[in-house]
Amino acid sequence: MERGGYGGGSGQGYNNFAVPPPNYQQMPNKTGNYNEPPPNYGKQGGGYDSGSGHRGSGGSGNGGGGGGSWNDRGGNSYGNGGASKDSYNKGHGGYSGGGGGGGGGGGGGSGGNDMITQEDTIFVSGMDPSTTEQDIETHFGAIGIIKKDKRTMKPKIWLYKNKETGASKGEATVTYDDTNAAQSAIEWFDGRDFNGNAIKVSLAQRQNNWNKGGGGGGGGGGRGGFGGRRGGGGGGGGGGGGGGRFDRGGGGGGGRYDRGGGGGGGGGGGNVQPRDGDWKCNSCNNTNFAWRNECNRCKTPKGDDEGSSGGGGGGGYGGGGGGGGYDRGNDRGSGGGGYHNRDRGGNSQGGGGGGGGGGGYSRFNDNNGGGRGGRGGGGGNRRDGGPMRNDGGMRSRPY
């Protein structure tokens, strides 16, 4: 038998060759089942086939575990992505012949919950809930000039309220004309009494939305098995890479017996959750608070399009791999699935493996986008499966 998936050489993962081989006198002799998945190039890969006919262990780190298989059914494969987001790729092998290997683990997303300190803005907490914006302006305006909003010409004071009840939380931000006034406000008002409450005053912070790169692309689907009455089903599609802040995608579709493997999934979501109602400017890609009616950067009025999510890949039927998802909000799609059986799979029932997921990208910095996922494996090529044609060849992108 051929052992299941294996990963890179360093780290915690290793190939365990201490498992005794199966007793070939106690199980049927299947010939031609060379179901060896392609190597995973991620670090700390692991996983092996114990010879029990079940799935190989999932690899740790960046590489996904390979699908171990013998007899009639291919094993499952679980691949964990690295960094801040886990990709979950599960590739089912085919029935009635050799099973397809699972897809490799997707790459992790870059970026994190980085916070930027606003040197000209203070955050005030612990106030009495009955405090109004006028009270705040009078009290904190005594130490320096409060900045005016250019559109409304009102002081830049934001009073935080409960979204359900509309009641004040006793917290607010105040933006001054210069940073020295903000520092002076902290020194003068922090810990002091305001309307009967001792308040806390510090520099305000906000999320860093401008340098978040997308996650890496998912691994390619496994190769379909040889032999049997029909060609083995194609491996499952690779998992999608991490997307930007508002991009979320589905996982790759698994293969099905004597059918084509599923397409690669859409990009995984970033780890920064937008607030309810936040919207993205169609002109400069700036993310604005829900209460703004125009972009605070380029002054473009608020539009209806706030970005869309990448769709998941569909499972293939009749030999063809399913199509990958796409992002409706822009021109960057996720990885497509395998083409029809004439291009990627067998001529008859041996379906092609799904393509890897497209790499995510940052809406705010296009240079930090993730890499494209791996290619899907070919279909089975014995008897009804038919020979493969143009397997693994490059094709023009549909976007």
From Swiss-Prot:
CDD domains for the chain: RRM_SARFH (cd12534)
What does the entry list under GO cellular component? catalytic step 2 spliceosome; nucleoplasm; nucleus; transcription factor TFIID complex
Question: What sequence ranges are listed for the domain RRM?
Answer: 120-206
Which residue windows does the record flag with biased composition (Low complexity)?
387-399
Q: In which tissues is it expressed?
A: Ubiquitous. Enriched in the brain and central nervous system during embryogenesis. Enriched in the adult head. Embryos contain both isoforms A and B, whereas later in development (heads and torsos) only isoform B is detected.
Transmembrane residues, as ranges?
A: none
Record's keyword annotation contains Zinc-finger: yes
Record's family? Belongs to the RRM TET family.
**Identification of the protein by name:** RNA-binding protein cabeza
Species this protein is from: Drosophila melanogaster (Fruit fly)
Which gene codes for it? caz
